[in-house]
Design a protein with these regions (language model features):
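Conserved non-transmembrane functional hotspots
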Residues: 236-539
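Acidic/glycine-enriched connector segments
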Residues: 2-222, 226
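Membrane-interfacial terminal anchoring regions of lipid-handling membrane enzymes
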Residues: 175, 183-185, 194-276
């Protein structure tokens, strides 16, 4: 199938192609001190350049609301460096532009927004209306609070041009930084809200803080901070501020970059062979943002299948070679003690070790599991978005609730999902067409969708598991019959058939043992239970 059009026209995180960019969101003060701007600009440029150089396989995109001051400064530097710009606006453009006090700032906003790769207008917050947010006051401030939450939820690094002071201004820089760390924004989040992640290691808390002052009375930085200072600022208990990227985040970024590198390497095959969740007919009636999720899903799904083939090759090969090693041992010890059998044994051992080593170095098993997990997370994310399902919280998105209790290293999967779902999360979609699509394609019936998939796979695994058990029973009874005949035979006849019977039993037991080991390695019994459970859920 030729889906090349999807590859070249789908923009994910401000970029085309299958790589998932590193997203830097901007929060900062509007009233920067003019004398400090050159140094701040230089530091921002150095920061973005270093990131781009360190992660060439995925690239960097900047997310900025293009407000006066810090937002426009960073956006300008990003464009100068050739870094894609994403512009989420807190409200409709015609309402937002009223917050720009001078013609020069408005013109700069218009210029920057015209150069943005993607621009979103966030929906009206729950309980408010277009009329209420048109007036200055709490309702309008709620839009800025929503913007701050959106930036935090859809970036990998929050770039804060900040004086370091906490304040009570709803949606202000101090509150956005606090929300990024603690998931708390007084006046917007419920009082009981805390970190949504059960794990101690939260990959979404990373702030790059550039200290600045403000052009107002008492505008100096917080005590202990100096203008021009910069640091990585996270929830690390031992070293919350550091000059180098914390290792836990570096590890997450490394896995995401590895996915992007693989996606780029196999981009042509993904374009030609990967199977999408949406057809061209679906594109015409469903939100455009779903294409982003589908685009990343195709890469993750194809790569999962690709590395599954490598993993299964290694698994089957090593088990087959183990069986051959056993046969060589039996042949040498019970048939003909020829050295060629020993050489063959060693050769099979070396070959099995080489295959196992190559599989480990290329991470076939880990990548298969990780990419399959990512693909299934994206599948759920797409169908939830199409059906208009949300997490039940105005401060949480689908990716925030995924894999909360799993290995912290899987945080990179949320990193990918937060980029793929950005455009969908920027809209408030709820239509019957999306719900019908989800029920038809995801739920399906006995022959289609997830219902049909789990039924078919469950039956397939059940048949394979049954064959393994039947084989073990056959060998058991054949062995019992052979030993019984051996006991009942005369001494002379028994001596004649003793060696062939022993060899036959050894070979049969070896074959069954390898078969059961293979079945255990691919977890047939456990998968049968899981597929039966999922089939009942979708039923």
């Amino acid at each position: 199938m030729d889906f090349s059009q999807t590859q070249f026209h789908t923009i994910v995180g401000g970029q085309v192609g299958f790589a998932v960019p590193l997203i830097v969101a901007v929060t900062g003060h509007r009233d920067l001190v003019a004398e400090e701007i050159p140094a701040i600009r230089e530091r921002v440029s150095k920061f973005l350049t270093d990131l781009r150089d360190e992660y060439p396989d995925r690239g960097v995109s900047v997310m900025s609301a293009l407000a006066e001051g810090a937002d426009q400064l960073v956006a300008t530097e990003a464009l100068r460096l050739g870094i894609p710009l994403i512009a989420p606006l807190p409200m409709e453009r015609k309402l937002y532009i009223r917050d720009f006090e001078t013609i020069k700032v408005q013109e700069n906003f218009e210029f920057l927004s015209s150069r943005a790769a993607e621009t979103y207008e966030l929906p009206v917050t729950p309980g408010n209306t277009i009329e209420s947010i048109s007036e200055y006051g709490d309702a309008r401030d709620q839009q800025y609070a929503q913007l701050g939450v959106f930036l935090c939820a859809h970036c990998h690094i929050l770039l804060a041009l900040w004086d370091g002071k906490d304040n009570d201004k709803l949606g202000g820089t101090g509150q956005v930084v606090r929300f990024h760390h603690d998931d708390v924004m007084p006046g917007y989040t419920p009082e009981a809200t805390g970190s949504g992640l059960i794990l101690a290691d939260d990959e979404s808390d990373l702030v790059y803080h550039i200290v600045c002052s403000r052009d107002r009375p008492d505008g100096q930085p917080a005590e202990g901070l100096e203008v021009g200072d910069y640091s990585w600022f996270s929830l690390d208990k031992d070293e919350p501020r550091s000059k180098t990227l914390p290792e836990s985040h570096r590890r997450v970024f490394r896995f995401t970059s590895e996915f992007s590198k693989d996606a780029i390497r196999y981009s042509d095959k993904i374009s030609d062979d990967a199977w999408p969740l949406m057809t061209k007919e679906d594109h015409a009636v469903l939100p455009v943002g779903l294409r982003d999720i589908d685009h990343v899903f195709r890469a993750a799904d194809w790569l999962a299948i690709h590395y599954q083939k490598g993993m299964m090759f290694a698994l089957k090969s090593t088990h087959f070679l183990a069986m051959l090693m056993g046969l060589m041992y039996i042949a040498y010890s019970d048939m003909l003690p020829m050295r060629i059998f020993l050489y063959a044994f060693l050769g099979f051992f070396v070959l099995a070790t080489a295959i196992h080593t190559i599989g480990n170095r290329r991470s076939w098993h880990r990548k298969y599991l990780d990419y399959r997990t990512l693909a299934e997370g994206l599948r759920v994310q797409l169908y939830w978005a199409a059906a208009g399902v949300n997490s039940g919280s105005k401060t949480k998105y689908t990716h925030d609730t995924f894999l909360q209790t799993q290995d912290p290293d899987l945080g990179w999967i949320r990193n990918v999902m937060r980029v793929a779902g950005t455009e969908c999360d920027a809209s408030d979609y709820s239509a019957q067409a999306g719900l019908d699509f989800t029920l038809r394609e995801w739920l399906g019936d006995a022959d289609s969708g997830q219902l049909g998939y789990f039924r078919r796979k469950g039956e397939e695994l059940e048949r394979r598991h049954r064959r393994t058990e039947q084989m073990a029973k056959i060998v058991l009874w054949v062995g019992f019959a052979a030993i019984s005949l051996f006991v009942l035979m005369s001494a002379d006849l028994g001596e004649l058939v003793r060696d062939p019977v022993v060899v036959l039993m050894g070979v049969m037991l070896l074959f069954v043992g390898v078969r059961q080991s293979y079945s255990f390695s691919i977890a047939d019994a456990e998968l049968i239970k899981q597929y039966e459970f999922m089939f009942r859920i979708f039923s």
